[in-house]
Amino acid sequence: MNPRRQKRLIVISAIVLVIGAAIGLMLYALSQNIDLFYTPSEVIDGKQIGQVTEVPQVGQRLRIGGMVVPGSVKRDNESLAVSFDLIDTGPIVTVSYQGLLPDLFREGQGIVATGVLTAENHIEAHEVLAKHDEEYMPPELAEKMKGIKHVKPEQAYSTPKVSG
């Protein structure tokens, strides 16, 4: 091989190698920022992806959506710490959060929390979002929540009418 072709081959090989390394680093960085969406049942039992059941690992970042279990909200009087249970159609997952909860956060309402799985059924959230009206629900959660009766806030807090 003549020197000119050899030099050209080395330059092209180096360019391909640099581009491949850059693409690999970008994909690695993007994979670190992915927060997969789970329901409480999927956190405990795993999420079916094709033929494989994927169970989230302790330490994994994720988003979880479900209904806040009535009577499960526990607030710390000394700080902004709060914990509550989430449920869909199956197991219960406990969520801990340090901070102010959204104004629309209520027991029996749907929420989405972003955080880290710290135990098999416990999530340390760094963000909690409440749905903005009675009808909104993320599509993934709506699909999983079919069949669960939702009580509207007006019905939950209304007083019985007395007829005279």
UniProtKB/Swiss-Prot annotation:
This protein's GO CC annotations: plasma membrane
Metal-binding keyword on record: yes
Sequence ranges on the Cytoplasmic membrane side: 1-8
**Matching Gene3D superfamilies:** Nucleic acid-binding proteins (2.40.50.140)
Q: What is this protein called?
A: Cytochrome c-type biogenesis protein CcmE
Matching entries from InterPro entries are given as: CcmE, CcmE-like_sf, NA-bd_OB-fold
* Family membership: Belongs to the CcmE/CycJ family.
